Amino acid sequence: YFFSLFKALIPKSKIKNLDQLEEFIQTKSAWVSQVTLYSYLKTRMGTRYVLHFDNDEFMKSVNEAKWNIYSVALQDLTFFTFSYLKNNFNFEYTNKSKEIFLKILDNETTNNMPLDIIDKTKKVFDERLQSINWNEYSNDIPFNQSALSLYEWAPIAEELKSLDRKIVLNSVILKWDIIKKEFKERIQF
C-alpha cells in the first residue's frame, strides 16, 4: 500500500532504445485502454457494477471491447511515438514502427488476444501506415482513433452512449495527455 503512494515520486527510467520504447507502447496502451473502459463501465453501471462480472455474456462483450480498444490504442501510440521521434530527434527509422507493433501483437497471443482481432488490427495498421504523415501526426489529433474505439466498443446501450459521446472521447484524450507528457519527459534517443 505504501509503495503505491511513493511510486509516483520515484523517477521513471529514460527511454533510450527501441526495446524500452516497445515496452512503453505496450504498457501505456494497455493502461489507457483498461482504465478508460472499466471507468466508463463503472460510471454507467453504478456501485453494483461488480455483480455484472458474473455474467458470462457480459464478460464476453467486455473482453471483446478490451482487445479492440487496446488494438487501436497500440496503433495510435506507436504512430505518435515514432512521429514525435522523427520530428524532435531526427529519428528517420519510422519503418521500425511496424516491426515493434507486430512484435507487441505477437506477444499478446500469450495473453489470449483473439487471433481474428490481431489479423484485423494488422490490416488496419498497414492501411493507416500507408497514409500517415510522420511530420504531422504527433502534432495533430494522434489519439482520436482510440477515443472513438472506446465509444464504439464499450458494451453500453446505444441510447446511453449517444448521451456520453463527448465525455467518453474527452476522458480518453485526457488519459493520453498524461502519457504524452510522460513520454516527452522520458524519451532520450
Locate predicted features.
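N-terminal interaction modules that seed assembly of large macromolecular complexes
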Residues: 40-90
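Alpha-helical repeat scaffolds in large eukaryotic proteins
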Residues: 38, 42, 78-86, 102-110, ...
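Leu/Val/Ala/Ile-rich N-terminal alpha-helices, chiefly Sec-type signal peptides and the beginnings
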Residues: 1-54, 64
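Helix-driven interaction modules
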Residues: 106-189
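Residue-level detector of alpha-helical secondary structure
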Residues: 3-10, 22, 98, 102, ...
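Residues within HEAT/ARM-like alpha-solenoid scaffolds
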Residues: 68-72, 76, 96, 113-116, ...
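Eukaryote-specific, cytoplasm-facing alpha-helical/coiled-coil scaffolding segments in long proteins
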Residues: 61-65, 98-112
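Short acidic alpha-helical/loop segments enriched in Asp/Glu that coordinate divalent cations
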Residues: 50-53, 86-100, 113-117
